[in-house]
């Protein structure tokens, strides 16, 4: 076997007949499988031991040689070699076909490779191959045309006309083989290149296609005639097994049936040829053989598929590779692993952030080998076998050993669906009783887990390296920030929020108000003994609290509450005392009004202060973010645990209960509804009198009911009692929002009908009053739609993530600095007056390209190539700077990846990104994971405002990334200049917009109903939209430059996500958009050996031009191409990656003809062949480390080496298309 970690590239080519023979260990001549009596494989059959190897280790078929000492001997009685039975997974056989047969991939694929090579239509090919027509192979001296097609009847007539032997015409794959042998590649390529100089239209397109295929054959060394098979490889028997079931029946792989048909027909054909049977019978048999081989390679590609019992189509070699259940996705990209388990999860409120609870029985099974080794090491028993017995018996002594073994041995917990990297995190196991895994409540948000029956899987990292990586890189306590936006992902929720909210409440006039304490302990003791309430405002000597006070504050009394003293207890030293729930207090300290001189009038001072609101969920999030910024991970996770404990403790003490009486009543609800009824009546009257249209009536009625609901909501908010338990839950952010509250106490309002249209009849009742039967019926629409939408959305969002990952999986941070001379000019993103993403947010964590100066003073705020921190970004914006040139992924020059400076900080850690970080995958996850939160709907704008539907939510994101023509497309101008006139043409129901500029004039026809974005006299730039709507990016690329298109796409994606309240870092979208514009179409090859019209990577294109320019030639010209992510994934340089994504057969067909080499640079290719991935610690620069003292310069900029080139030998794994391996579980 080839050592996976030693080879650096993998090539796929067409297999020549001699190659297939060299693989084979013998010819399969009989269709038999195994003998029904002896259950031994039949000789020369599909499971023959002579050909494929022994069925038992180190034993020949007849039993003459047994044991390993005879290894390598071939038995003189039965002819079986004595070796491991594992060879039955790798030894191949072959079938000598009695007539040539075409390979269906090359004849049937789109475009047909055979058809292009021979310049024949696929229809004509099919007629010849399946014996329906003759093709002229050699016209000799007759006027017949070479390659012309004739029916049986025409053939006989021509023979009569010109005489026997005057020309050669044949049928079947044999004829095509002869034609393919005649193809002179060099000559044809030269002729096509000449033709391309003058050809236009369809002719040109066809010539480019033919040239592409012929050139592929020429450069790869594949011979066109190898597309016809004279010899068929038989894959190893253990990859198409037969298993005996209970009751003596057999279950066999479909491939055995398909091979059996081929062998039967081949043997029958041989017999007919021996007997000199009539031509028509032989022809029929040859056609059947062709169909049998077609079915074996790709059943169902042509005609009706061959079916097995119960008319189920048989799974052919192609089906073994395709789709989710195929070889690539089922067995190569994702395998089931040992040392894993799964169970229901339950909450573990007492756990630390880095711990998880593992049930004892589960742990003993998972850590069995470790426990057994330790038992032997302690001399409790002598050998491993006895240790195993001890463990299985459940001996008392094993539990203490288990405790020691699992100490500091992290385990991984994973919850499906794993939407982003936080879906798998490492924890230290803690043994618990029971059968459920215990999960820390704060990591639930990252996993999107809850405890209503969710299950999670647990995995054990085995090697020292794996344990180290789990502990250092994956420990849950390290994952404070969300990679998509750099905000904390572990904010407390529910009970924890409620407890801290209750703890920090302030109330006037509670017991003990105005007491003064010398220190924290005295205050807490007074509270515990009931002298002072948690919410009472009291005084405490400032210098007794260990906080960063100023000298002046140190000798005063601080006015606060006992709850806040306890709350500040858990905060790290060095953080200001938290008195008010706002950012000013958090960053600058307590305002002066809360300090009183020693001996001051405290009751009076308290009565002059307003009551502060308590700390809500959002405030807690801000505190965590600030602490992370100041103290980093360790301190933050410790604080989170303290905050969790405090929250749980005080929500228990608060003892909140909810009863129906806690839902308030709005006194004047009846009047508000009565008023609305009257107004609706007026609107209906206006409609009846013809004063307004039906659409206007509908909009006015729905607006009226909305207003009524809002009025009720406002009343509720105004009259709410801050101590009402429901209000507390809602206000703190623990559960529920104002909309839920107003459905409980106000009115439910308008509902959507199944078609998405809002129904005019609102639900006037609320849940406290109860709904009528009709109202209940109306509500069911919304509930059902919600469920179906969620189900559909989840599938759509998952597929989007899969496409995104596939297109960007090989984008890795490859170097420190690419030295680009370009940058990206950014400003805030806004839509009309609405701010979508501010400049400050966009600048944070990026590197500058140019110096940023103060617009008024000219003072330098930050130099070039410097990291913009949060504070610097704020300073830049406060100075009034509106646009900044930054380093961007768009302008990065690194090949197959990005450099550290163009990427900026890693949002998940808040530090500069490391070389080796798989930023492409992280970007894909960051965009895909919130996909489920986006809406599905296309908004219908009441039929009045405009006639276009604006696509929003998930469909719009897909539209952008697939570079589709948008719905409601905007008209753009190709001329920079002034709008001179807008004319309306009533006859065609259109408007004409005239733009005049220096380069010329433009006249644009826009629909009558479209809303204009420009007016007469206005200035427009090239590519500017004249009407409302989305711009088609491909059209924009034709008018403007690549950077403009990239910037436009970035802004559009941000608009969708931000409008739904989802924040995503720009850099993630930049990574994806850059992958969509990596290709160039060659327009004129110049002196390079590129082919006109081919699509190629921009780097390969520049390389080709560099070589020509150095030699003083004419460079090629090309045009950048924008591709959707699906197409971009299939156009990747790695055929393994593309084949495992979609259209497997098409990708492999194309790769084999080109003799493509996969250099294994991306992640997927390496996972497929089982090599460590070239990202993170798997990069060569980290794996080949030798510890020694090093100077920093050399460390940061190591000598450039091609990734993956460890000291290796080049191994060409000859993977023919015809040999498609399949493994069976």
Curated annotation (Swiss-Prot):
GO CC terms: DNA-directed RNA polymerase complex
The reaction(s) this protein catalyses: RNA(n) + a ribonucleoside 5'-triphosphate = RNA(n+1) + diphosphate
EC number(s) reported in the record: 2.7.7.6
A matching Pfam family: RNA_pol_Rpb1_2
Keyword Manganese in annotation: no
Function: DNA-dependent RNA polymerase catalyzes the transcription of DNA into RNA using the four ribonucleoside triphosphates as substrates.
Assembly information from the UniProt record: The RNAP catalytic core consists of 2 alpha, 1 beta, 1 beta' and 1 omega subunit. When a sigma factor is associated with the core the holoenzyme is formed, which can initiate transcription.
Protein name: DNA-directed RNA polymerase subunit beta'
Originating species: Streptococcus pneumoniae (strain ATCC BAA-255 / R6)
């Amino acid at each position: 076997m080839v050592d996976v970690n030693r080879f650096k590239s993998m090539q796929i080519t067409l297999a020549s007949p001699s190659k297939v023979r060299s693989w084979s260990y013998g010819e399969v001549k009989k269709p038999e499988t195994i003998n029904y009596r002896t259950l031994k494989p039949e000789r020369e059959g599909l499971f023959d031991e002579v050909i494929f190897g022994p069925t038992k280790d180190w034993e020949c078929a007849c039993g003459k040689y047994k044991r390993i000492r005879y290894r390598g001997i071939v038995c003189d009685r039965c002819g079986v070699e004595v070796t491991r039975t594992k060879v039955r997974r790798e030894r191949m056989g072959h079938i000598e076909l009695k007539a040539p047969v075409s390979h269906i991939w090359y004849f049937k694929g789109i475009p047909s490779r055979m058809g292009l090579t021979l310049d024949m239509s696929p229809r004509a090919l099919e007629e010849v191959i399946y014996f329906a027509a003759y093709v002229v192979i050699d016209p000799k001296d007759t006027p017949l045309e070479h390659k012309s097609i004739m029916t049986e009847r025409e053939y006989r007539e021509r023979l009569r006309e010109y005489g026997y032997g005057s020309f050669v015409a044949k049928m079947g794959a044999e004829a095509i083989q002869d034609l393919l042998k005649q193809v002179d590649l060099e000559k044809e390529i030269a002729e096509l290149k000449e033709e391309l100089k003058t050809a236009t239209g369809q002719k040109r397109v066809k010539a480019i296609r033919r040239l592409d295929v012929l050139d592929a054959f020429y450069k790869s060394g594949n011979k066109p005639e190898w597309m016809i098979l004279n010899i068929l490889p038989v894959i190893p028997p253990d990859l198409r097994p037969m298993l005996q079931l209970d009751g003596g029946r057999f279950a066999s792989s479909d491939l055995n049936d398909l091979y059996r048909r081929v062998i039967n027909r081949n043997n029958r054909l041989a017999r007919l040829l021996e007997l000199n049977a009539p031509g028509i019978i032989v022809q029929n048999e040859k056609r059947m053989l062709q169909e049998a081989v077609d079915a074996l390679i790709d059943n169902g590609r042509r005609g009706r598929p061959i079916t097995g019992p119960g008319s189920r189509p048989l799974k052919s070699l192609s089906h073994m590779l395709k789709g989710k259940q195929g070889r690539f996705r089922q067995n190569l990209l994702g395998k089931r692993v040992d040392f894993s388990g799964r169970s229901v999860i339950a909450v573990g409120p007492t756990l630390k952030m880095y711990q998880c609870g593992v049930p004892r029985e589960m742990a003993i099974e998972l850590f069995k080998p470790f426990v057994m080794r330790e038992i032997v090491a302690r001399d409790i028993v002598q050998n491993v076998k006895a240790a195993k017995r001890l463990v299985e018996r459940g001996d008392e002594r094993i539990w203490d050993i288990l405790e020691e073994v699992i100490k500091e041995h992290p385990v991984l917990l994973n919850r499906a669906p794993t939407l982003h990297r936080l879906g798998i995190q490492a924890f230290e196991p803690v043994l618990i009783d029971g059968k459920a895994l215990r999960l820390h409540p704060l990591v639930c948000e990252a996993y999107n887990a809850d405890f209503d029956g969710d299950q999670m899987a647990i995995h054990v990292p085995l090697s020292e390296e794996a344990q180290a990586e789990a502990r250092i890189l994956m420990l849950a306590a390290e994952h404070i920030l969300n990679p998509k936006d750099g905000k904390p992902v572990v904010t407390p929720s529910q009970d924890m929020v409620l407890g801290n909210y209750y703890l920090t409440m302030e109330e006037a006039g509670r017991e003990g108000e105005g007491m003064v304490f010398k220190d924290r302990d005295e205050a807490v003791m007074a509270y515990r003994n009931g002298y002072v309430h948690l919410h009472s405002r009291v005084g405490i000597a400032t210098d007794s609290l260990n906080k960063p006070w100023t000298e002046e504050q140190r000798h005063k009394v601080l006015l606060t509450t006992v709850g806040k003293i306890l709350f500040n207890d858990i905060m790290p030293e060095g953080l200001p005392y938290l008195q008010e729930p706002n950012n000013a207090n958090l960053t600058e300290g307590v305002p002066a009004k809360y300090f009183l001189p020693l001996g001051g009038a405290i009751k009076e001072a308290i009565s002059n202060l307003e009551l502060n609101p308590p700390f809500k969920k959002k405030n807690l999030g801000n505190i965590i973010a600030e602490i992370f910024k100041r103290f980093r991970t360790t301190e933050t996770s410790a604080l989170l645990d303290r905050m969790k404990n405090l929250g749980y403790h005080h929500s228990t003490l608060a003892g909140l209960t909810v009863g129906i009486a806690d839902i308030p009543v709005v006194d004047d609800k009846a009047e508000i509804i009565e008023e609305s009824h009257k107004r609706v009546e007026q609107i209906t009257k206006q409609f009846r009198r013809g004063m307004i249209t039906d659409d206007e009536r509908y909009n006015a009625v729905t607006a009226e009911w909305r207003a009524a609901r809002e009025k009720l909501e406002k009343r509720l908010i105004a009259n709410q009692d801050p101590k009402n338990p429901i209000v507390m839950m809602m206000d703190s952010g623990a559960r529920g929002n104002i909309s839920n509250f107003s459905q409980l106490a106000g009115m439910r309002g308008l509902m959507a009908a199944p078609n998405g249209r809002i129904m005019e009849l609102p639900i006037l009742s609320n849940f406290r009053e109860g709904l009528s039967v009709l109202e209940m019926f109306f509500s069911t629409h919304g509930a059902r739609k919600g469920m179906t939408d969620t189900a559909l959305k989840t599938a759509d969002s998952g597929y989007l993530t899969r496409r995104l990952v596939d297109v960007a999986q090989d984008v890795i941070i490859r170097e420190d600095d690419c030295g680009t001379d370009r940058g990206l000019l950014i400003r805030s993103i806004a839509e009309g007056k609405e701010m979508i993403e501010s400049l400050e947010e966009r600048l944070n964590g990026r590197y500058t390209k140019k110096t940023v100066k103060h617009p008024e003073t000219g003072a330098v705020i930050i130099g070039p190539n410097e990291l913009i921190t949060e504070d610097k970004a704020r300073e830049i914006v406060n100075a009034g700077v509106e646009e900044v040139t930054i380093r961007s992924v768009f302008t990065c020059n690194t090949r197959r990846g990005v450099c550290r400076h163009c990427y900026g900080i890693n949002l998940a850690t808040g530090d500069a990104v490391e070389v080796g970080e798989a930023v492409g995958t992280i970007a894909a996850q960051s965009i895909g994971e919130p996909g489920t939160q986006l809406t599905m709907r296309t908004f219908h704008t009441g039929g009045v405002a405009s006639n276009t539907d604006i696509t929003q939510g998930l469909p719009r994101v897909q539209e952008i990334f697939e570079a589709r023509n948008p719905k409601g497309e905007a008209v753009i101008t190709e001329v920079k200049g002034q709008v001179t006139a807008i004319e309306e043409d009533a006859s065609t129901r259109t408007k004409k917009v005239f733009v005049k500029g220096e380069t010329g004039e433009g006249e644009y026809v826009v629909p009558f109903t479209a809303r204009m974005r420009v007016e007469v006299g206005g200035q427009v730039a090239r590519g500017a939209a004249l009407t409302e709507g989305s711009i088609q990016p491909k059209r924009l690329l034709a008018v403007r430059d690549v950077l403009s298109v990239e910037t436009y796409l970035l802004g559009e994606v941000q608009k969708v996500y931000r409008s739904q309240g989802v924040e995503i870092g720009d850099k993630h979208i930049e990574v994806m958009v850059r992958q969509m514009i990596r290709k160039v179409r060659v327009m004129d090859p110049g002196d390079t050996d590129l082919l006109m019209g081919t699509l190629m990577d921009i780097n390969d294109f520049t390389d080709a031009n560099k070589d020509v320019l150095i030699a003083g030639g004419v460079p090629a010209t090309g045009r950048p191409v924008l591709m959707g992510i699906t197409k971009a994934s299939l156009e990747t340089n790695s055929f393994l990656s593309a084949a495992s994504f979609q259209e497997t057969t098409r990708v492999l067909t194309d790769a084999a003809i080109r003799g493509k080499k996969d250099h294994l640079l991306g992640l997927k290719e390496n996972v497929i062949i089982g090599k460590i991935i070239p990202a993170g610690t798997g990069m060569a620069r980290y794996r080949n480390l030798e510890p020694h003292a090093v100077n920093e310069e050399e460390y940061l900029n190591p000598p450039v080496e091609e990734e993956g080139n460890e000291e290796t030998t080049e191994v060409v794994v000859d993977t023919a298309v015809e040999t498609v391996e399949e493994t069976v579980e």
